[in-house]
Amino acid sequence: RGITHGILALFLVPLIIAVIAGFRKGFFYYYFLSFLAYGIHIFMDLTNQYGTRVLSPFDWNAYSLDISFIIDPYISIGLFLCVVLGRFNRKRAALIAAITFILFFSYFGGRYYLRNATKDFLKEKLEANTYKMCPLPNDFLRWWFIAKSGDEIKVGFADLFTKRICIQDTFTFNDKDPLIERSKETKFVKNFLYFAKYPYPEIRKEGSRTIVMWRELAYSFMPGEHFTAKVTFDENNKPIKSEFKF
């Protein structure tokens, strides 16, 4: 989701496709279809909290709308039905596709509204400087939140239906430890920090070894170790192992 999902690629990739396939029905026909398809693809990536460098190469910050999870069954089923119905009724394939995308954008609009409503509710219940709302799998009224005040970070669930919030963890951010700084030099942590929008490092001891664990708080509601980078140091504080988990 780097330069291939940026504004430059949005114009360049359809151009390449149109040049290759343009001899069949014309350059502009394929360019328009490719531009539309690639633009919708980038937009759908932009809807989840993973982050997309949509303005690259002019701006390398990752942006996200935070309104849908990485895999949304409603989107997948909708696309599948659109393809199947279009294959069986080719005369109305364009109409079926148009209705599908109208429903999709209505769906995204509804989720955008619910996210903002939940965020406003959270602000009434929890005092913080910044608030981040993250979508949960197959859920509309319950959202994962990250609330930050200075060096203190609180994460948990905000439920718009029951009008309740549940704080799961409270962290104190501190990345000044020498081992944390050294862990940033490893390949896996560099890759992790490239996409992580809310990274949080923690240190723990296991015998004579020290482990630096980086977590992406936007996905920390998932059980187990997901979206983490881990570096193990020996008793002499030398890195002996590093790993990355999705």
Briefly describe each language-model feature range.
Residues 1-126, 131-135:
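N-terminal membrane-targeting hydrophobic helices
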Residues 129-130, 137-144, 148-246:
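Extracytosolic and intramembrane catalytic regions of membrane-associated proteins
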